[in-house]
Amino acid sequence: MTRLYKTTNGIDYIEHLNHIRPPGDKSNEHAMFFGIDATAHMLLRRDNPSSPTRSQALLGTALPPYQDWEWRRLNVRIGGPSIIQIAPNKVIACIRRYGNGNWTELGWIDIKKASYEPAIRLPSGGDTSYAGLVWRDMKLWISYYSSHEGKTSIYLSKAIIE
């Protein structure tokens, strides 16, 4: 279950919304960001082995006060999502992909079209996921773990985004 909390002092929190995810959906991991216009965006992993389309990620959007969410299906199955907005209309996701093995990948999210476009496959494989993203000085720093070199290790990558 995903909940939103609010605070006025950074110490005491109260529940704002009890259940964001679509009712009855087999969703679990998520990542979110707030756009410069205060719109909330959430990238949501779903698992439903009986239906390929019901395993595709969802992109959720809500305006303040974040009570009503619109959910649209993305064209990709994901794991361990991380998402960051680096400029207006420039949203990058780092996800675990499934296919012929697992790998960690950077890609572009088009918020308006609710679509995902792969950009680069990071050195990864096996047990890999859960990236952290930092945008600083026009560079994207990515930390993630992977077991593609045998023992599971943590990796740090830097990407120049044009």
Provide a role label for each language-model segment:
Residues M1-G80, I84-G126, W135-E162:
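Beta-rich carbohydrate-recognition and catalytic domains
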